Swiss-Prot record:
Outcome of mutating W22A: Decreased heat stability
Miscellaneous field: It interacts physically with carbamoyl-phosphate synthetase (CKase), forming a channeling cluster for carbamoyl phosphate. This prevents the thermodenaturation of carbamoyl phosphate, an extremely thermolabile and potentially toxic metabolic intermediate.
GO biological process: arginine biosynthetic process via ornithine; citrulline biosynthetic process; L-arginine biosynthetic process
Gene3D superfamilies per record: Aspartate/ornithine carbamoyltransferase
Temperature dependence per UniProt: Extreme thermal stability. It maintains about 50% of its activity after heat treatment for 60 minutes at 100 degrees Celsius.
Keyword Membrane: no
Binding site for L-ornithine: N166, D230, S234, M235
PROSITE patterns noted in UniProt: CARBAMOYLTRANSFERASE
Group of enzyme by EC: transferase
Note on domains (UniProt): The monomer folds into two domains of similar size. The N-terminal domain is the carbamoylphosphate-binding domain; ornithine binds to the C-terminal domain.
Segment forming the signal sequence: none
Protein name: Ornithine carbamoyltransferase, anabolic
Amino acid sequence: MVVSLAGRDLLCLQDYTAEEIWTILETAKMFKIWQKIGKPHRLLEGKTLAMIFQKPSTRTRVSFEVAMAHLGGHALYLNAQDLQLRRGETIADTARVLSRYVDAIMARVYDHKDVEDLAKYATVPVINGLSDFSHPCQALADYMTIWEKKGTIKGVKVVYVGDGNNVAHSLMIAGTKLGADVVVATPEGYEPDEKVIKWAEQNAAESGGSFELLHDPVKAVKDADVIYTDVWASMGQEAEAEERRKIFRPFQVNKDLVKHAKPDYMFMHCLPAHRGEEVTDDVIDSPNSVVWDQAENRLHAQKAVLALVMGGIKF
């Protein structure tokens, strides 16, 4: 079966089949090899990506800009000051106007509804660079990394420890679609969205994977192949940071916790890391840590998304 993603939005990975996700991962792997051997892949010559940033980012901005450059296209950075949204122009009108100038839109937003509205009114593909609900590009890079290092995704025990946030949501969705055994451990009251839990359970039933939600990090990481964490307070939650530090302290990924995982476990973090909070130096800097490979794979995974949805490559 030929899979074409041309013209598709990428808002949430629940909208994609396992086959479509694998198409992205396989394309990303191909681009990574091509880059390593110096093979040109300027598949988006003359195309432009508008990048809307309501919130700043190192990895998202740099990886998307470099991805478009490698693909022969151009990335246009637009922050809140560059747009008329603050002066009353609607997201719908912004989407309509940008669609007349560019070939795709990537948006990093606070509210997931903003990226949904962009997609509703844009006539070009819209890519979610991060919202408060999901972070699909991160999950694609994460599972690309797991596939590279473990040789498979099916049956791999992926344990997320911390806040049931956007990163957890996308990790749950993609992992259960691809047949992983996904476990999420959070403090009570900080669980993932109920809707995402149901999706994960349904996905696992279809893929042969599994999903489990726990409140005990030690029990969760037992025999883990992958331990993943993220910051305890996301951007916009600064007022809660002190309270969250107290609540999440027992969920810190440290040398005592990782003893319960498999000896060859992988430590993952979407970065930036708050060292000494959600993870200690002796874990993130250990030989088990793959965070830098994971960060690099954002470039390759997003390059695949761009080439596929902007019509540069078809399978």
